[in-house]
Every structure is written in C-alpha cells, then in structure tokens.
Amino acid sequence: MDAFDAIPDPVVIDILNRVGDVKTLIRCRSVSKRFNSLATQSESLLLQLDQILGATESDSEIDSPIASFFRSLFKSIHGLLPPIFSKPANSDEILTRSPKTPAQILSGFERIRNLEVELYGGDVKLEKGAAVKWKAEFGKTLKSCVIVAFRSATVNTSAATEAAAVVDGVVESDSEFVCGLKTRVVWTISALMAASTRHYLMRDLVKDHKEMEKLIVRDSDGEGTVVMDAAGMKEYRETEVRGDNKESERVGERTVVPSVRMSMRHAPSLMLKSGICLEAATLVVVRPTGVASDDNDVELVTEAFAGDGDDCMYGEAVTALLKRRRNVLEMNSF
C-alpha cells in the first residue's frame, strides 16, 4: 500500500467535490478501481455540455487550479498503471462515446446534491447591441421569471449622477409605455421559451436523481439561468408519477409556459449612476396567473439581480427600474 492509499475515503471525496468538473471526474474514474468508486460519490458537480459534447482538449476551457492539478497528476501516473487499468483509462474514448443527454452523462454518479449545468451559449436572438438577462424558477412548471433587457448601452460620464436622478423621477405616460411594447413582449416571450426549453432538457435528470437538492442551468454567455430547488424537483417528480400532464405538458422540445401575469416596467432612456445609458430599458416579472404573491416584485428582482456583484450594471438598472410605474399584462399559455 502506498501513501496515497492511506488517505481516508472521506478526504478523497472532499477533494473530488472541490474539483466538481464532470470531465475531470470522468478521468478520475479511469485511474483506478478506487477512484472509479469514489468519483461517483461526488456531491457537487459542474457539467459543461460544450466540453462533453464533441469538444476537444484543444478547445478553450477554464479549469480551476485543482482540476488542472488532477489532470496533470493523472496523465503522469497513467503510464505507470498495470495493464488491468490501461484499457479503461482512456478518458478521451470515454468522452467520445459519452451519450448526448445530461441524464445519461451523469448516470454513473450516485450522490449528486448540487448540480450546475453550463450550456454552450445563450438562446435569445436579438438585434445587434440589444441584451436580455433572465432568471427563472421551475417546479413542475414555471414558478417565476425575472427579465431585464435593453436595446443598447452607451457610456456617458458627463453629469451622469444628475441625469440618473432626473430619469428616476419621471412618470412614464401611457403613450411612452405603448411605444416599443411589441419589442418588449417579444423579448419576454423569447426568454420564457428559452427557460422552458432548459427545463425540458433536465426532465430525465430530475427524475433519475432523487437525491438532488439544487439544480442550476446557465449558459456560458451569462444570459439566462434556470433554478430548481429540492421542493420544485419533488413537485415535478410527483407530477410525472401521477401522470398529471395538465400542468407539465410539453410542446416540441420544451415545457409549456402556463398563462401568466407580467409586471412590466420601462424607461425609454435610463441613465445609471455609473455613467451607462440604457435605451429601452425594461424589467419584467412573470408569474403564473392566479399566484397570490403578486406584489413582492422587489424581493424577487433583488434576489435575481441586485445582489449580483459580477453584474453591477444589471443590479443598478433593476434598482432604478423598480422605481418606475408598473404596468400589468396577461398572456395565455403557449
């Protein structure tokens, strides 16, 4: 027995949890029988689908220092392993023949608690210069979705603070709200369709891994995020077991979006204190029709964006937009 074999299993599992990256853990499994057993017990995973589905080692990828260390270590000791381990240790072959769905890729992992899935890129197609950022929560169907969008962003540092104060105090007229409404509705529908598509993509994964407590599905562009907590996933599984498709029916390759109420706030031109001017800035809070908590927009929006230190522009924008007049619209299921 060497020094590495003397390390207790819980310590090794804790190290593997810190690695997290599924691609690296698949390589861990190919090192030895012990690693093959322990790697599948990792509880916190990051699945980057662009890496698993056809990406090569030369593709650009961002690894943590721990993941890089493990990759170097395993490449070094791979040649020293006895023949009994040599054949299954070809991780490139494992990745090449990996199935294409998240559920199949993760079928060998037994104790997933927290899973983050990163998709290749965003889903919403916009005109040049426009941007949409959204966060949606799902159970058996959509629970809520917060969307912030704008047509363009420019930097103007002159008198930014004064301009921002003036814009925040403006009361939008009905004619100003109607102007550009079609575009804002299209942004909203596009975000909801993207969210429901991601929810549908995770259906088998949620059903198979009953031990999961949190699921996050995001994209590498930072456009949108789908979140499911333990209660939401349990609700989804129970609906599937009962065969109750009324609320969780599918259309094409996505979950049906239920009838919703949209709280929409808009500013034709929003000057932020940071000096950034957003044209056609829009904030939309979407909830299924009939949901009682229709007035806690501030809490929902703050949780989605305002506390995000990496996206201070969006946090500042939603804080300013929350001061604008709220217009309520309804939309049928689609």
From Swiss-Prot:
Induction: Induced by auxin. Its main location: nucleus. SUPFAM superfamilies: F-box domain. Keywords: Nucleus, Ubl conjugation pathway. Residues 1-49 form the F-box domain. Pathway: Protein modification; protein ubiquitination. The keyword Nucleus applies. It is found in: Nucleus. InterPro entries: AUF1-like (IPR044809), F-box-like_dom_sf (IPR036047), F-box_dom (IPR001810). One of its GO terms (cellular component) is nucleus. GO terms for biological process: acropetal auxin transport; basipetal auxin transport; cytokinin-activated signaling pathway; protein ubiquitination. Component of SCF(ASK-cullin-F-box) E3 ubiquitin ligase complexes, which may mediate the ubiquitination and subsequent proteasomal degradation of target proteins. Involved in the control of basipetal and acropetal auxin transport by promoting the distribution and expression of the auxin transporter PIN2. Promotes cytokinin-mediated cell expansion in the root elongation and differentiation zone, without affecting root cell division. This is F-box protein AUF1. Gene3D superfamilies: 1.20.1280.50. The F-box is necessary for the interaction with ASK proteins. Part of a SCF (ASK-cullin-F-box) protein ligase complex. Interacts with SKP1A/ASK1, SKP1B/ASK2, ASK11 and ASK13.
